[in-house]
């Protein structure tokens, strides 16, 4: 990092969990970062507060019905105000931006990420759906435009850190750790009666609603396997998921000689966020440290694929390839929304996803338009079933 010049950041999804924690990192090091642009989907009040506090050059609200309110609230400040999803796709191309934090939830993060890569911006990747849906396309674009993609997910950040300095050494496998979520010890019968409130209580991490449900169903871990495949160029057969309830080891890499490197830390998303923003430098932080005196044990177990079929769906989707990962993502987004609205049971989600995988029109080499069409088609189909 150039020590004199501040790194200019755009945060897509600044009012969400990752977005707000990114702003906390900026507050921790105001001499290192400046916020060029922040965007939100619908949370206009939080966006107004953030704009007043961080004074970005530009602010975008995707929900156009909130544009007038945003514009009026910031009228006394020299901030450019935009409305609509297209504006988010365009703002990432702004010349002063050095790094784009893709903290939007779901498929909507894909197009802005593609535009940012084409504009040569470094990507701090928090929107895992981008790699799940279109990992191959993203990798090709990143290579073509020589754009670094820096993982923000704690697991992928851990692997990224473990691989540092190992460029010429054989990687035998990546080991992704999973907390197991709040229902790790449940029976099939208990899972049938899970409530939204129960599912939203994650034992270790603080996250948004969508991600918390994905963690409870282990779909999140499935997505992380897909993401790891594209980020690190390994086959799914070389990615192992291990349940580690304490969430102290964030992930591991096993090398050809049998040695294993692990990255440990407190379950605090600000750590991987900061590393992505400052790579290859490490800044000091005031964040909590591990207390080795109170840490009693680190335990590990196999994931239960019978209880959590979503993880198996992810491996199946990788094996089938083409647009099937996109199918899984679209079906899952509709299922999670329906579960949060209490229209389906927790155990209905993996069943609907499996059905979508069966019914989808298979495309071996999808283009961006194919991904968009698959996404539309599957969402409509699953909505109809619900």
Each predicted region: which residue ranges?
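Catalytic, metal-anchored helix/loop core of enzyme active sites in primary metabolism
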Residues: 1-386
């Amino acid at each position: 990092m150039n020590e004199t010049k501040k790194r200019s950041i755009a945060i897509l999804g600044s009012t969400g969990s990752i977005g707000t924690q990114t702003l906390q990192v900026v507050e921790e090091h105001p001499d290192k970062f400046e916020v060029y642009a922040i965007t939100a989907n619908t949370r206009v009040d939080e966006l107004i507060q953030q704009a007043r506090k961080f004074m970005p050059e530009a602010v975008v609200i995707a929900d156009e019905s909130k544009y007038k309110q945003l514009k009026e609230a910031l009228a006394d400040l020299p901030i450019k105000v935009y409305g609509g999803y297209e504006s988010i796709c365009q703002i990432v191309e702004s010349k002063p931006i050095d790094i784009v934090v893709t903290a939007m939830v779901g498929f909507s993060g894909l197009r802005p990420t593609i535009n940012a890569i084409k504009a040569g911006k470094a990507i701090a990747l928090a929107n895992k759906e981008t790699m799940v849906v279109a990992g191959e396309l993203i990798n090709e674009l990143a290579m073509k435009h020589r754009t670094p993609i820096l993982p923000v997910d704690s697991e992928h950040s851990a692997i990224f850190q473990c691989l540092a300095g190992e460029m010429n050494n054989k990687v035998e496998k990546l080991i992704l750790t999973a907390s197991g979520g709040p229902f790790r010890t449940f029976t099939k019968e208990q899972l049938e009666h899970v409530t939204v409130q129960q599912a939203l209580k994650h034992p270790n991490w603080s996250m948004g609603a969508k991600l918390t449900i994905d963690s409870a169903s282990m779909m999140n871990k499935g997505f992380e396997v897909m993401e790891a495949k594209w980020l690190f160029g390994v086959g799914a057969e070389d990615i192992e998921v291990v349940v580690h309830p304490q969430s102290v080891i964030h992930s591991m890499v096993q090398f050809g000689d049998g040695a294993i490197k692990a990255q440990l830390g407190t379950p605090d998303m600000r750590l991987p966020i900061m590393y992505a923003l400052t790579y290859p430098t490490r800044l000091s932080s005031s964040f909590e440290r591990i207390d080795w005196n109170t840490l009693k044990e680190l335990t590990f177990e196999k994931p239960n694929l019978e209880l959590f079929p979503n993880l198996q769906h992810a491996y199946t989707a990788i094996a089938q390839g083409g647009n099937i990962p996109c199918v899984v993502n679209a079906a899952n987004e509709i299922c999670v929304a329906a579960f949060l609205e209490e229209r389906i049971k927790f155990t209905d989600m993996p069943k609907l996803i499996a059905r979508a995988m069966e019914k989808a029109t298979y495309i071996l080499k999808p283009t961006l338009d194919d991904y968009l069409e698959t996404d539309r088609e599957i969402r409509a189909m699953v909505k109809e079933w619900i």
